């Protein structure tokens, strides 16, 4: 998917020195790139028995919601703590300098739901692992994690596969971090 990869800009030294930030806003601004991205996911996941798509705040919403619409299934927003109004279930995870918490509504998942988990990118995998654990608490089966970008040098997709047996599909990869 070199077309999609070519539409993603790299911002050096953001958010801190030494980081190469992979910015998907340039992809989102490009109608051809956006259509190709969503179309790639639709082609991969249609007719797979997916019952819901879950997206991780905030950029996972950008592919997850339109994909759920195209697949004819519901969308589950996975939010940061305190952002959902009804009863929630939460999962804590480690950050580079501390901890964070993500939540979903308790009634968002039915036991046996076959969930596709979406985000824009997987790096170290911390947020994605927490999201998988959160969905599994409510009885979901995770079909796969779909991302636009994998940063394989940071090991997140490998951890997700090895620790939780959840495969990761990425449209493109970038070396480094």
Curated annotation (Swiss-Prot):
SUPFAM superfamilies assigned to the protein according to its UniProt record, in alphabetical order: PRTase-like
Task: Report the principal subcellular site.
Answer: cytoplasm
Identify the metabolic or biological route this protein is part of.
Answer: Purine metabolism; AMP biosynthesis via salvage pathway; AMP from adenine: step 1/1
- What keywords are assigned to this protein? Cytoplasm, Glycosyltransferase, Purine salvage, Transferase
**Gene Ontology biological-process entries:** adenine salvage; AMP salvage; purine ribonucleoside salvage
Q: Which GO terms describe its molecular function?
A: adenine phosphoribosyltransferase activity
CDD domains with a match to the protein in the record: PRTases_typeI (cd06223)
Give the top-rank taxon of the lineage listed in the UniProt record for this protein: Bacteria
Tell me which GO cellular component terms the UniProt record holds: cytoplasm
Q: Gene3D superfamilies recorded for this chain?
A: 3.40.50.2020
Subunit comment: Homodimer.
Instruction: Please identify the protein, giving its name as recorded.
Output: Adenine phosphoribosyltransferase
């Amino acid at each position: 998917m070199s077309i999609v990869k070519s539409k993603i800009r790299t911002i050096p030294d953001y958010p801190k020195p030494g980081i190469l930030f992979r910015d998907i806003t340039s992809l989102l601004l490009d109608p051809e790139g956006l259509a190709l991205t969503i179309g790639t996911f639709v082609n991969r996941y249609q007719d797979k028995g997916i019952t819901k798509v879950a997206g991780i705040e905030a950029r996972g919403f950008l592919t997850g919601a339109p994909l759920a619409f195209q697949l004819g299934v519901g969308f589950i927003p996975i939010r940061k703590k305190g952002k959902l109004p009804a009863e929630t279930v939460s999962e804590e995870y480690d950050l580079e300098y501390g901890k964070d918490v993500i939540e979903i509504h308790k009634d968002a998942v039915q036991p046996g739901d076959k969930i596709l988990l979406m985000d824009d990118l997987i790096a170290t995998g911390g947020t994605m692992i927490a999201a998988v654990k959160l969905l599994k608490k409510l009885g979901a089966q995770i079909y796969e994690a779909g991302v636009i970008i994998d940063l394989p040098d940071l090991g997140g997709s490998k951890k997700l596969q090895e620790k939780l047996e959840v495969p990761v599909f990425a449209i493109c990869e970038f070396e480094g971090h």
